[in-house]
Curated annotation (Swiss-Prot):
Pfam families in alphabetical order: Ribosomal_L9_C, Ribosomal_L9_N
Gene3D superfamilies: Ribosomal protein L9, C-terminal domain, Ribosomal protein L9, N-terminal domain
Keyword Thylakoid in record: no
Entry annotated with the keyword Isomerase: no
GO biological process, one term: translation
GO molecular function: rRNA binding; structural constituent of ribosome
The name this protein goes by in its record: Large ribosomal subunit protein bL9
Phylogenetic classification of the source organism: Bacteria, Bacillati, Cyanobacteriota, Cyanophyceae, Synechococcales
Length: 152
């Protein structure tokens, strides 16, 4: 009896791999769990061709997303500076702080494009001034914007 069998995964499985990966598993695991639950397919030449085709399409999509992120990064640097207006006390200290949501809102107003607030890294801002803010646009593309905090 074979020690390991090869299967192609149909979905992401946490401890095993991602959709489309070719993995070696125990024959019982493949026979009793992966194959009956349609979480994997046995390896055949046809399945391997489908996997290659799917990977090529995925690579094209990923390249397009990366290019879009690079274009957006260029747009952000072209704009240069974003301004957030906050209420300030007499000594120049903000009431509250500048949050990721505030930055996302200002960027959306200027570029008409949504940014997930969780992808924005804002330093601790407690006063009026100029700050650098990091925005993660893609796994490999980050943008740094200049943020000016003013009073209203």
């Amino acid at each position: 009896m074979a020690k390991r069998v090869q299967v192609v995964l149909n979905e992401d499985i946490k401890s095993l791999g991602n959709d489309g990966d070719l993995v070696e598993v125990a024959p019982g695991f493949a026979r009793n769990f992966l194959l009956p639950n349609k979480k994997a397919l046995p390896v055949t030449p046809t399945v391997l061709k489908q996997v290659e085709h799917r990977r090529a399409k995925q690579a094209e999509k990923e390249a397009a997303k990366k290019q879009e992120a690079i274009d957006f990064q260029t747009a952000l640097t072209t704009i240069g500076r974003f301004t957030v207006k906050k209420q300030v006390g007499e000594d120049g200290v903000l009431f509250g702080t500048v949050t990721n949501g505030d930055v996302a809102e200002v960027v959306k107003e200027a570029t008409k494009k949504d940014i997930d607030r969780r992808d924005i890294s804002v330093p601790e801002i407690h006063g009026v001034g100029k700050y650098k803010v990091q925005i993660k646009l893609h796994n490999e593309v980050n943008a740094e914007i200049n943020l000016e905090v003013t009073s209203y």
